[in-house]
């Protein structure tokens, strides 16, 4: 079974290929050292693929240009593009992207033969996407494609400044691709007042009405909290009047600043809600523990990073032991190099004698921490394959019983009725292990330093997100404006 490469996968492959071939560049050698070079290059290659531009085509374009920076840039990019496709061909047996594979394989997929396909939310299509549409339409029972357009003034959309110019160009391309296309106009379900407001929005002199507009209410609030609180109170009023929570949608310009706020304030009003904001996993204790662990190893027992790791409660220490150890290290002036000296710590700071933190007790805690971290510290000290780094980290997770701890947390959350928290503990463990496995598949044999592996894994952890499901069938949906599928709700707060 073949899995499509994620954006993170592509960046890692391109980063490794760039590091191996830097000497072959003409002008991109300095740019290749920038942190976001792989991300920009990945986006450029994806764009080329979308428009059916191959590495060979880029090389041909560079060849006909006059001598200059652009010629050398295109040559370098075409070289990396070719290396990238060759790597995918060698490692995975095919350099095809998702759209290429879908266009070629659609005719072999049985369930498409009787399927009714709906394509919605597009204003234009790339050449590769048009190939996919053609392949699907050839085998499916019916293919319906929706485009936003003004049906009464369709020909006006040819103008360069027309609101629906891109959609009209897509319509003409589809008409050529599907000569037997049937055009239908979807009924406009918007309230007449909203429709008039929408249709005259870009007019030089907006239309005015003498009667109050009932379908649209505009309110002003001093800050986000007051804004969300007002929405919550209005929702309660609507529900008391007979509305269902599922009839109501809150649409925000950006999910991040509003999602947590809506969850907290709606909970105060006993309003069930579901936010489709993809929560990053870096806020989970396991992600924080791995980040702190790698920083501890990289910075040679950094005190700040070490105690961040210990305070995640994932290490086999009691919180009291962690606090006592931190208090001792601060009072005794313990530095990083004191951790890997052979002898026990001998100094007992004044004032700690009567706090139960005797030297035997403190050295016992220190030994447990050192014994757990030292194998990883030694493994990351030199250069090794990415596979061995991943194996060492996986072994550390096993030795620290991280999986068992998370399973216990999951069970406790389920017993307390916190299903969302329980799913988070389950998902984060599975996704971290999957990340390590994915890195081995992508570049397992690549030699690198411990610092390079730390950078790669840290970036991978930042890419992980929780996948959550609505807690109930009847709930208010909080989403961002980019997700237009929710705009059919009878009541919308923007």
Where are these regions (language model features)?
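Polyanion-engaging groove/track-forming segments
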Residues: 1-494
């Amino acid at each position: 079974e073949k899995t499509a490469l994620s954006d993170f996968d592509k960046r890692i492959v391109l980063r490794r290929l760039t590091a191996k071939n830097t000497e072959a560049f003409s002008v991109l050698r300095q740019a290749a050292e920038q942190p976001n070079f792989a991300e920009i290059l990945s986006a450029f290659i994806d764009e080329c693929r979308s428009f059916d531009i191959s590495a060979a085509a880029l090389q041909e374009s560079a060849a006909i240009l006059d001598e200059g920076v652009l010629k050398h840039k295109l040559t370098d990019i075409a070289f990396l593009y070719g290396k990238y496709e060759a790597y995918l061909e060698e490692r995975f047996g095919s350099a095809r992207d998702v759209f290429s594979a879908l266009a070629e394989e659609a005719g072999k997929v049985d369930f498409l033969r009787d399927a009714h396909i709906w394509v919605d939310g597009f204003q234009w299509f790339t050449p590769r996407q048009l190939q996919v549409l053609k392949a699907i339409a050839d085998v499916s029972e019916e293919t319906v494609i929706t485009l936003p357009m003004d049906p009464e003034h369709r020909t006006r959309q040819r103008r360069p400044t027309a609101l629906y110019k891109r959609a009209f160009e897509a319509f003409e391309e589809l008409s050529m691709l599907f000569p037997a296309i049937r055009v239908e106009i979807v009924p406009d379900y918007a309230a007449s007042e909203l429709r008039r407001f929408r249709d005259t929005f870009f007019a030089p002199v907006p239309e005015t009405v003498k009667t109050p507009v009932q379908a649209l209410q505009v309110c002003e609030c001093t800050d986000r909290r007051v804004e969300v609180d007002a929405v919550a109170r209005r929702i309660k009023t609507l529900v008391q009047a007979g509305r269902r929570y599922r009839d109501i949608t809150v649409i925000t310009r950006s999910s991040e600043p509003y999602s947590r706020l809506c969850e907290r304030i709606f909970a105060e009003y006993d309003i069930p809600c579901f936010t489709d904001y993809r929560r990053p996993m870096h806020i989970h204790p396991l992600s924080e523990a791995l980040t702190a662990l790698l920083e501890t190893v990289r910075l040679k027992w950094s005190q700040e990073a070490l105690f961040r790791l210990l305070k995640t409660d994932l290490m086999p220490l009691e919180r009291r032991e962690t606090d006592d150890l931190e208090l001792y290290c601060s009072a005794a002036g313990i530095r990083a190099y004191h951790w890997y000296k052979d002898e026990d710590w001998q100094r007992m700071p004044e004032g700690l004698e009567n706090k139960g933190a005797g030297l035997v007790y403190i050295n016992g805690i220190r030994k447990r921490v050192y014994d757990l971290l030292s194998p990883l510290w030694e493994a990351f000290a030199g250069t090794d394959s990415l596979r061995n780094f991943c194996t060492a980290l996986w072994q550390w997770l096993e030795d620290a019983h991280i999986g068992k701890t998370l399973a216990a947390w999951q069970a406790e959350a389920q017993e307390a009725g916190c299903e969302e928290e329980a799913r988070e503990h389950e998902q984060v463990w599975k996704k971290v292990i999957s990340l390590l496995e994915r890195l081995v598949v992508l570049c397992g044999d690549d030699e690198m330093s411990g610092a390079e592996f730390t950078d790669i894994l840290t970036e991978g952890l930042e890419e992980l997100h929780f996948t959550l499901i609505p807690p109930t069938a009847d709930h208010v949906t909080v989403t961002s404006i980019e997700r237009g599928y929710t705009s059919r709700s009878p009541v919308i707060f923007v």
